[in-house]
């Protein structure tokens, strides 16, 4: 069965309480349940991992026990060459996803180290963006088989 890693970066554990006007009111657990339901309908397995620590996210990627990934790098999107390098090194496709649209926010969020190595980016669509991203990565992984 196709296995998709949903990798959540720093501060995403605070969903539902951190700046809900930007990130919404759904908690990370609620978001993951929604993704699980959608994955069930697609016939794929999803695994979730969230960390506030860059090295832990990279270590999880290095496990390479998945066919593709959804990645919300949080603030690391704008700063982490190491995360980018790990994504390139593992040779697994991923879709970048963000609840908000970083390009329409503060100037420092205009830098994106991940977008050009992702197979697609889904931004600014709230929790529904994760479902769209899952559809995209499942289609992409299916076309590689």
Indicate where each model-derived feature is located.
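Extreme N-terminal starter segment of soluble prokaryotic enzymes
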Residues: 1-4
């Amino acid at each position: 069965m196709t296995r998709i890693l949903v990798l959540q970066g720093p501060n995403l554990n605070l969903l539902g309480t951190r700046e809900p006007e930007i990130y919404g009111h759904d908690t990370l657990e609620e978001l993951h349940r929604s993704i699980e339901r959608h994955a069930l309908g697609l016939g794929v397995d999803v695994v979730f991992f969230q960390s506030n620590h860059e090295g832990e996210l990279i270590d999880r990627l290095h496990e390479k026990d998945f066919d593709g990934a959804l990645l919300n790098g949080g603030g690391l999107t704008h700063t982490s060459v190491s995360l980018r390098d790990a994504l390139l090194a593992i040779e697994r496709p991923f879709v970048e996803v963000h609840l908000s649209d970083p390009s329409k926010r503060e100037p420092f969020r205009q830098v994106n180290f991940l977008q050009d190595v992702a197979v697609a980016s889904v931004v600014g669509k709230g929790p529904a963006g994760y479902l769209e991203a899952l559809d995209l990565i499942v289609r992409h992984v299916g076309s590689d088989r």
